[in-house]
């Protein structure tokens, strides 16, 4: 495994571990998701450059577009829950009460 592959794999795993273990605030969960998406975007971009395949160069742009949509939906949910519940703590959110 090259150092580049190791760094992007470790960045993805760190984002996944942060999402799994630091589940106190919604904003920290969204930041971990964004870190995972960023590492996937860079890894896909480098993979398309290494393979010199122009057909696969669309995939990183699609991933980036979906990542932006995910971030905007997450921030909208963050604002909505902060207005209704007064906090962004994930323990105060319950799907049965919302």
Swiss-Prot record:
GO terms for molecular function: NADH dehydrogenase (ubiquinone) activity. InterPro entries: NADH_UbQ_OxRdtase_chain4L/K, NUOK/Mnh_C1-like. It is an enzyme of class 7 (translocase). Pfam families: Oxidored_q2. Keywords: Electron transport, Membrane, Mitochondrion, NAD, Respiratory chain, Translocase, Transmembrane, Transmembrane helix, Transport, Ubiquinone. GO terms for cellular component: mitochondrial membrane; respiratory chain complex I. It is found in: Mitochondrion membrane. The chain crosses the membrane at residues 1-21, 29-49, 58-78. It comes from the Eukaryota. Its EC number is 7.1.1.2. It is a multi-pass membrane protein. Coiled coil: none annotated. GO terms for biological process: ATP synthesis coupled electron transport. It catalyses: a ubiquinone + NADH + 5 H(+)(in) = a ubiquinol + NAD(+) + 4 H(+)(out). Core subunit of the mitochondrial membrane respiratory chain NADH dehydrogenase (Complex I) which catalyzes electron transfer from NADH through the respiratory chain, using ubiquinone as an electron acceptor. Part of the enzyme membrane arm which is embedded in the lipid bilayer and involved in proton translocation. Belongs to the complex I subunit 4L family. This is NADH-ubiquinone oxidoreductase chain 4L. It comes from Oncorhynchus kisutch (Coho salmon). The gene is MT-ND4L.
């Amino acid at each position: 495994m090259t150092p580049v592959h190791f760094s992007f794999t470790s960045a993805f795993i760190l984002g996944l571990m942060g999402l799994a273990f630091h589940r106190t605030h919604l904003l920290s969960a969204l930041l971990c998701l964004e870190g995972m998406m960023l590492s996937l975007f860079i890894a896909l971009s480098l993979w398309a450059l290494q393979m010199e395949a122009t057909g696969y160069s669309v995939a990183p742009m699609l991933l980036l577009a979906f990542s932006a949509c995910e971030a905007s939906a997450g921030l909208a949910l963050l604002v909505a829950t902060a207005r209704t519940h007064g906090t962004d703590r994930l323990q105060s959110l319950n799907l049965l009460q919302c």
